[in-house]
């Protein structure tokens, strides 16, 4: 049980997908201008990453490995992710039309989010079992959501702050992301792998 907790904490804080592995930077910068949009995108991405991680593990274990089709791994994972994203889009459209409108084009773009494909491929490369895959996918998504919500809150405050003209917009956003990455480096001694 401790191993699962350490895997979760290590994935959320120590090996954060955005700030350490630099995966998922497009939605991180694109959706983080408003806090409510970042929260909605975080929930959608959490659902997709967790489900895609589990489904990819199942496809790899029960289809690709027995049939010796490992060379189709990336292509099949992309297909699995696309199906999961379409399912998520249908669920969000039916349950929360306001969130669906807020997310706009970013919801279908979760399909091309490299963090989602990254979590599926890293699960296989690290030889996780089913439960570890689910925890790793959920931890990666929770870390992604945490960083995106924190960054959105900071960006909302920076929008009304007195920032020098050359640093307004993306410049101060990248500086802030760099400082957040340095702050998360403080967690590096928390979990030993």
Swiss-Prot record:
The chain crosses the membrane at residues 5-25, 39-59, 62-82, 102-122, 134-154, 171-191. It holds the Pfam family Rnf-Nqr. PANTHER family: INTEGRAL MEMBRANE PROTEIN OF SOXR-REDUCING COMPLEX (PTHR30335), ION-TRANSLOCATING OXIDOREDUCTASE COMPLEX SUBUNIT A (PTHR30335:SF0). It is a multi-pass membrane protein. The keyword Cell membrane applies. Its EC number is 7.-.-.-. GO terms for biological process: electron transport chain. GO terms for cellular component: plasma membrane. The keyword Transport applies. The gene is rnfA. It comes from Photorhabdus laumondii subsp. laumondii (strain DSM 15139 / CIP 105565 / TT01) (Photorhabdus luminescens subsp. laumondii). Part of a membrane-bound complex that couples electron transfer with translocation of ions across the membrane. This is Ion-translocating oxidoreductase complex subunit A.
């Amino acid at each position: 049980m401790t191993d699962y907790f350490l895997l979760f904490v290590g994935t959320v804080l120590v090996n954060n997908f955005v700030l350490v592995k630099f995966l998922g930077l497009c939605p991180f910068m694109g959706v983080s201008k408003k806090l409510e949009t970042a929260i909605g995108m975080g929930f959608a991405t959490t659902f997709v990453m967790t489900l895609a991680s589990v489904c990819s593990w199942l496809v790899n274990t029960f289809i690709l490995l027995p049939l010796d089709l490992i060379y189709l791994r990336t292509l099949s994972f992309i297909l699995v992710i696309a199906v999961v994203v379409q399912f998520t889009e249908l669920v969000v459209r039916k349950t929360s039309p306001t969130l669906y409108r807020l997310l706009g084009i970013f919801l279908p773009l979760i399909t091309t989010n490299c963090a989602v494909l990254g979590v599926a491929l890293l699960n296989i490369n690290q030889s996780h079992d089913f439960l570890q895959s689910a925890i790793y996918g959920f931890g990666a998504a929770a870390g992604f959501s945490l960083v995106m919500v924190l960054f959105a809150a900071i960006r909302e405050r920076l929008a009304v702050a007195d920032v020098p003209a050359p640093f307004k917009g993306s410049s101060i956003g990248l500086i802030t992301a760099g400082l957040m990455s340095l702050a998360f480096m403080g967690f590096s001694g928390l979990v030993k792998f």
